[in-house]
Amino acid sequence: MRPAGRSANQVRPVTLTRNYTKHAEGSVLVEFGDTKVLCTASIEEGVPRFLKGQGQGWITAEYGMLPRATHTRNAREAAKGKQGGRTMEIQRLIARALRAAVDLKTLGEFTITLDCDVVQADGGTRTASITGACVALADALNKLVANGKLKTNPMKGMVAAVSVGIVNGEAICDLEYVEDSAAETDMNVVMTEDGRIIEVQGTAEGEPFSHEELLTLLALARGGIESIVATQKAALEN
């Protein structure tokens, strides 16, 4: 029995609250159960130096956790004077995932920065960040079109992510913290809305997993992501 009584393939309740802050071109509070992340999308004219004159845009991301997002307080990374390796890995993952959702040539010479700040962590903060940031990105791109700065919306489709893993020998979807900390295998999967894989991050924390178990986990992830994408689309229609 899972802690919340969920079935193996069931994701936590997912809530996407749009326009959560007033200044950013796109802002979403995403909730996966007790995990809560504020995702904002900010638009700037111009692109990084390595892209100048190429007629395409860029999407980048930053990720951070509030000091008391976890059980015990973690000092802000700014106070330490540098970002940790985990932070850099996650923000690069978010950026890669969201670049897959956009035609960068159609975006033109704009840079969109996605800021994902974890308010409360209970497992799956990176997958929640990708899911919420995609909706914030969609809102920002819609504003570029509405303001006449783009003729065509460069959004190719939704992107979402979910964690899967093996806990006590059972493959499960969308791990909360107590499950994640006990997992024999932990995996994060990012997919497009039509089920194509953008990224798979998988590690055997204890017992190595088989090829068959890998396929089972990917199938679980696809089912979970289909449910999450439906929630994303419903949020954008409201």
Curated annotation (Swiss-Prot):
One of its GO terms (molecular function) is tRNA nucleotidyltransferase activity. It catalyses: tRNA(n+1) + phosphate = tRNA(n) + a ribonucleoside 5'-diphosphate. One of its GO terms (biological process) is rRNA processing. The keyword DNA repair does not apply. InterPro entries: ExoRNase_PH_dom1, ExoRNase_PH_dom2, ExoRNase_PH_dom2_sf, PNPase/RNase_PH_dom_sf, Ribosomal_Su5_D2-typ_SF, RNase_PH, RNase_PH_bac-type, RNase_PH_CS. Its EC number is 2.7.7.56. Keywords: Nucleotidyltransferase, RNA-binding, rRNA processing, Transferase, tRNA processing, tRNA-binding. Phosphate binds at residues 86, 124-126. It is an enzyme of class 2 (transferase). HAMAP family: RNase_PH. Homohexameric ring arranged as a trimer of dimers. Belongs to the RNase PH family. Phosphorolytic 3'-5' exoribonuclease that plays an important role in tRNA 3'-end maturation. Removes nucleotide residues following the 3'-CCA terminus of tRNAs; can also add nucleotides to the ends of RNA molecules by using nucleoside diphosphates as substrates, but this may not be physiologically important. Probably plays a role in initiation of 16S rRNA degradation (leading to ribosome degradation) during starvation. This is Ribonuclease PH. It comes from Salmonella choleraesuis (strain SC-B67). The lineage of its organism: Bacteria, Pseudomonadati, Pseudomonadota, Gammaproteobacteria, Enterobacterales.
